[in-house]
Amino acid sequence: MDAQSSAPVPPPGCPAHGGRVPLYGPEFAADPQSYYDYLRHYGPTAPVELSPGVNATLVTEYSAALQLLQDPTSYRRDSRRWRELNEGRVPMDSPVLPLLVHRPNALFSDGAEHLRLRQAITDSMARIDQRRLARSTRQVSDFLLAQFGYRGSADLLSAYAKQLPLFVFNELFGCPADIGDRVMFGISGMFDGVNAEQSAQVLFGAVGELIALKRSRPGEDVTSWLLQHHAKLSDEEMVHQLSLLLGAGVEPLGNLLGNTLHRLLTHDAYAHQGGLIDEAIDDTLWENPPISNLGPHYPAADGEFAGEKVQAGDLLLVSYAAANSSPILAAERRASSRAHLAWSAGPHACPSKDPARQIAMTALENLFNKLPDIELAVPEQMLSWRPGPFNRALVSLPVRFTPSESAQRPQPAESAKPAPAAQPAGKGGRWSQFLNWLSK
């Protein structure tokens, strides 16, 4: 990579003169596109730092990203190959490690093992009834809107976009009240970074109980279908596959909802109905994908990638955001509005993109049908984005609207705050409240 010949100017606040470009911090969060524009001066790949002491090569060019994603023989997903980690050069307390270290699930597996685990997931997800999914999403949407619709204002991110996927996935996976409360506590805590280790233990414990329940009493849900699959997943494999599906589904989908809402509320070209919501989802996936940079790969052998030398075990990361926004992609975008890489590509492409899109579409349509005059409560420039290399996510999305006459003020028990982060939710958590509301 010859960064000196073109002498690109780093974006403001970027300490990248002659070194790796940091993909973290408030400057990157405020304007990641200027970083991607700068990184393109290096060529199809660029040297980056994911957090202090964690180095990677970022693939920023669309065709190079496809080459990486579609060649599982030359570039592996098993992070036990990560050379710098094996050499002790990666800080073990780095905040990015939880999303990169190996776990025995489909995301970090290769070859026949990956095919077995992935097939169980794709076959089970394919059994989801689309009408049931739409109905469940509308019910969850109505419940959440009832919690704040009477107020005339809300943080749409914490009250709606982040909550809705948790509820819908709980229903899809067949969680009873007590287990569902703990699943929601565990996932929220892991992604919020508050007591993450305890939250992970709560999640794994709840998922383990769910698996035991579904082995003895199967139902029409994803958990039961995974257990019944001919892949014959062990209990340990089930825990990791379910945790992967929940974690990889809930957080990105919540951010897709948040980012699409941001787009709909800040671009006058969109109407809050019909096909334009669908168009706004596509535009968000192109220009502001919820997962900006991920898809870790490791060369199986020393060689060359995109014109640059690579060593076996180097960490190569795909920038879905940079690849999607490449200036040379205008023709591809005109040819297909869904040729973006937001769902990744190749054998590790998102297996849940169709249900995720349906959930997003249904949730947004129902929101704007119930609150048609919703608008930002603050100037757009006051909105802030969470720092970090992987997700593109707002901190909050304050809105105002005419209070909904159909929204009922929740009773004190229903409006109770979630359990403190220091302790798991007990009986009467959010999922229990929803099930009680649904039964009325």
Language-model segments: residues:
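Cytochrome P450
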Residues: M1-K440
